[in-house]
A protein has these predicted regions:
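A generic structural motif
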Residues: 132-143
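Active-site-adjacent alpha-helix of alpha/beta-hydrolase-fold enzymes
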Residues: 122-129
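Switch/connector loops and helix/strand junctions flanking conserved nucleotide-binding motifs
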Residues: 116-118, 144-145
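Intrinsic disorder
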Residues: 22, 100-103, 131-132
Length: 153
């Protein structure tokens, strides 16, 4: 489920059972891996955590809910953005406001693929300042933060 900052339900996401991934050549079916109900617009996942942020406390941005859960399990406050191309102007404004009002520095471990790197670069560009988001590098054997987290726990 997706909630707004006040905890009101604003949407849901489910796994597409028609999606099939092949480990050969990293190919996948044309069906998307995740689906949103018709008419739903994608937002930042886990917005209620923003009310818990203290001045100067970091916020971790992840690419997808499972990475967000792993980051939360690591003791960090985190949100997930499915894609920079789906990011709404009002969601981007929320992230920008955190930096200006709470001195929140955003942190990100981009997924080890082209879309993950593109999300980080797009966020850095959209936020307007390279210093508003800090990039962390995963070890080379891990595809994303949840993969890394699971290997340690």
């Amino acid at each position: 489920p997706y909630y707004d900052i006040d905890g009101h339900l604003i949407g849901v996401q489910n796994r597409n059972l028609s999606y099939q991934s092949s480990s050969i050549n990293n190919q996948s079916s044309s069906a998307p891996r995740f689906k949103f109900p018709y008419g739903h617009t994608c937002h930042i996942y886990n917005l209620p955590v923003l009310k818990l942020l203290k001045k100067g406390e970091p916020l971790f941005i992840t690419e997808g809910a499972s990475d967000c859960w792993a980051m939360l399990s690591s003791g960090h406050k985190a949100v997930a953005i499915p894609s920079a191309t789906l990011l709404k102007p009002q969601d981007l404004q929320i992230l920008s406001t955190l930096n200006s009002q709470l001195s929140t520095v955003l942190h990100m471990y981009p997924d080890q693929d082209e879309p993950g790197e593109r999300l980080f670069l797009d966020l850095r560009r959209l936020l307007g300042s390279p210093s508003s988001i800090v990039r962390h590098q995963l070890p080379p054997d891990y595809k994303d933060y949840s993969d890394y987290y699971l290997s340690k726990h």
